Amino acid sequence: MSLTRLLIKDFRNIENADLALSPGFNFLVGANGSGKTSVLEAIYTLGHGRAFRSLQPGRVIRHEQEAFVLHGRLQGEERETSIGLTKDKQGDSKVRIDGTDGHKIAELAHLMPMQLITPEGFTLLNGGPKYRRAFLDWGCFHNEAGFFTAWSNLKRLLKQRNAALRQVSRYEQLRPWDKELIPLAEQISTWRAEYSIAIAQDMADTCQQFLPEFSLTFSFQRGWEKETDYADVLERSFERDRMLTYTAHGPHKADFRIRADGAPVEDTLSRGQLKLLMCALRLAQGEFLTRESGRRCLYLIDDFASELDDARRGLLASRLKATQSQVFVSVISAEHVIDMSDENSKMFTVEKGKITD
């Protein structure tokens, strides 16, 4: 499915924009601060309900306006789908799909699977475990129908359990929460483990093409001891959890560790190599989704040229083309993407929030 049309109103520095898009490559060219990243962010927000540069809705609404409006048309193999998102300064959202209101953000995310590659995306590799959990959870969300509901319930129960830890004196008082929490935690951990195994070969093959000089390994850690029932862990950790006032073990502490030649990648790879690895992982994840479900990702790439030399840019471009997916690329100069452009591409110039093609 590709985004054939995008309407933006009062988002960041963009007052109004109506863009007819290519199902292939779409290039956004402009100086720093011109608004090219804002276009990528509008697409991301349309599919996620939040921006990738700010979690506060008021910061992405254009100055002195009350709300932003985003609208898109998605073209699938058999039908077109109309989607829309409005969000005000208080953070209240309205999702519209095919002209009807009352839909959930998760429905947009399902309709628009996308991979985001930004200069800040190194956090996948050198940031905390939450970024790598999010990587696995993206895959589980798009591959397991029940994942989002289970994940939402897990978050709710953990919040309630942590609040209860401040009030209880005996473990038996926590059992009502743990009775619900334990099967959810085990199911989510099983899904994550199965996904990490299923995608391992895709990641290894893509990383070998991008970084043949390294031997990369991937390992999923579920957030509590191996071969130990989660129920036993919770009961045994009660006194410590009560002192900490939070649950110290569980799927919310899981990690997906990546090593190069036996050492953490953040200690071994250069910034250019880390960017290649990040791109390889995102590509592998998108290609796995296509093979398993027949659905294609949208790829959003901010500041395409940064950290990469000509040869590496060429390698990334050729792999992106091979996906036959829709790709949005922001660059400062068109010279950086001239070799990627073809008769099906579209080139947009962005200047002070105004977009022309």
Curated annotation (Swiss-Prot):
Short name of any one Pfam family annotated for the protein: SMC_N
Sequence positions that bind ATP: 30-37
Key words of the record: ATP-binding, Cytoplasm, DNA damage, DNA repair, DNA replication, DNA-binding, Nucleotide-binding, SOS response
Disulfide bonds: none
GO molecular function, one term: ATP binding
Keyword Endoplasmic reticulum: no
Gene Ontology CC annotations of this record: cytoplasm
Main location: cytoplasm
Zinc in keyword set: no
Subcellular location: Cytoplasm
GO process terms (BP): DNA replication; DNA synthesis involved in DNA repair; double-strand break repair; SOS response
Domain of life: Bacteria
NCBIfam families: recf (TIGR00611)
PANTHER family the UniProt entry points to: DNA REPLICATION AND REPAIR PROTEIN RECF
Protein family membership: Belongs to the RecF family.
Function: The RecF protein is involved in DNA metabolism; it is required for DNA replication and normal SOS inducibility. RecF binds preferentially to single-stranded, linear DNA. It also seems to bind ATP.
Identification of the protein by name: DNA replication and repair protein RecF
